[in-house]
Amino acid sequence: MIILLTGMPGSGKGEVAKAFKKLGIPVVSMGDAIREEAEKRGIPKTPEGLKYVSLKVREELGPGAVAILIAPKLKNLLKKHKTVVVEGVRSPKEVEEFRKLFPNEEIKVLAIHSPPGARYERMRKRGRSDDPKTWEEFLDRDKKELNFGIGEVIALADYMIVNDDSFQKFKRDIEVIIRKILYFNHQ
């Protein structure tokens, strides 16, 4: 089974990925695939460089490009593991591509939803170099994500976690949903 993890920036995808890793379930990051591709092409891993690589691979391979890039790694992992998680799916075309590339695998989409204000605060605190510095930058980034089609992926998810309360409640919700996904799909 392949679990496609999606959510707006700062929604809590990283925490969900950590929970899967703790259970020994491998997690492949779509963002890492772009960073690796940038390195291969000798392009700096700055926000501008990564955006360029992201657009370039989509131009070369189509809208499901990142799914194509990580497919070999996924195929390898699925030889040893019943379940693999893909973190950072952003468009319906990527979901489509995974279904095409892995026709014999059960594919489930898990979305994390969190209100904009909470996501903005979280992103400010984590301090990644590509995180927005102002509310306007944050709204701009959200607009770009929504233009990719992430809203549609979230809306059509098989499972949803709403991260709008305490961190403890979020962690409990993660555990519950992971158990539900693994139980119902390994019967």
UniProtKB/Swiss-Prot annotation:
Keywords: ATP-binding, Nucleotide-binding. Transmembrane segments: none annotated. The keyword ATP-binding applies. InterPro entries: NTP_hydrolase-rel, P-loop_NTPase. ATP binds at residues 7-14. The keyword Nucleotide-binding applies. One of its GO terms (molecular function) is ATP binding. Belongs to the UPF0200 family. HAMAP family: UPF0200 (MF_01111). This is UPF0200 protein PYRAB09750. It comes from Pyrococcus abyssi (strain GE5 / Orsay).
